[in-house]
Amino acid sequence: VVMVNRYYGWYLGFDLAEAEQGLEDELVAWADKHGKPILVTEYGGDAVAGLRSATSEPWTEEYQADLLDTYHRVFDRLDAVVGEHVWNFADFATMPSFIRVDGNKKGVFTRDRRPKLAAHRLRARWRGDG
């Protein structure tokens, strides 16, 4: 099994169309090179709970959910992808830095376990509704 952590659309630029193409190209290359199943062991992006936007802007709940949808489209197109593990279940504390004010916000739930929009999208995916 080939296991990869990838953050297209977050650490590697915010253009979701480019993220989708870059992710797919890379996963196809891994599949072609090794001929083994692929498990995406980490993927996602931060969202500040309650930060909403009519357009999908980085740090909003909409962007986080749309970013996950981008990854899921790629996973669903590629037979080589046999599993996925979104990063992360819930927001958590980290050392402060210019990219992490009050912790890591990649959780699909807040630190006190309130669901963000991404949690609802994942629920729909796992139930087969979306």
Could you describe each region identified by the protein language model?
Residues A124-G130:
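Surface beta-strand/loop "capping" patches
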Residues V1-L122:
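Substrate-binding/catalytic cleft of secreted carbohydrate-active enzymes
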